Amino acid sequence: MNVLFLTMSSGLKNIETSGIYTDLIRKFRDEGHEVYVVYPRERRLRLPTEVKHEDRVHLLGVKTLNVTKTNLIEKGLGQVTLERQFKLGLEKYFGKVKFDIILYSTPPITFTKVIRYAKKRNPKAVSYLLLKDIFPQNAVDLGILTKDGLKGVLYRLFRKKEKDLYRISDYIGCMSPANVKYVIEHNPEIDPAVVEIAPNSYDIPSEISVEYGVTDHIRQKYGLPINKPIFIYGGN
């Protein structure tokens, strides 16, 4: 099976490192599938568009503008041009590959044209959205956008793109039951049967070796009790 994965994550230089996307890529690879990844190579890296092949994993780094950690103007232009750059890279380097699954995650919500292009070339492929963030609603919750006024124009624009992304997706994987419920309730045009739970992918090691005394040192450094369990909330 050939899997196409579109992502904004630039941390894919070494797929053997632990991460929600690298772990997922390795799982597909280890099950005997070919994985084709398209990700941005931001301008600050000064690297060209390039494809690397590593044991059934094909990494296409597409040269883009800076889309993270930059000013709003470049970030906006970067997002606008990203679809075209990804589409051109996909056509040039993976144009002859027949994909069975088209996988992509949010953010961003601006991959619709790339996905539509990939589905047109691969009409039998299944498109699957990994819905990590519900945007633009999360921007409203954070006070970045509003539903009225000038910012409301941006909200409605992004809301339309969000709905377009849902519409083109054969399946939508959400982080939690509450997210599933939210997506269905606020997008009644979506068939509830295609919305399901798909939490972060993580390859849990069978054992973790920790040098003696290291944990006590870390607890002391941050003023945490030595003899009590510590729970860390990761945000999802």
Question: Regions from the language model: what does each represent?
Answer:
Residues 1-51, 55-58:
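N-terminal subdomain of nucleotide-sugar transferases
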Residues 217, 225-236:
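Conserved donor-binding/catalytic core segment of Leloir-type glycosyltransferases
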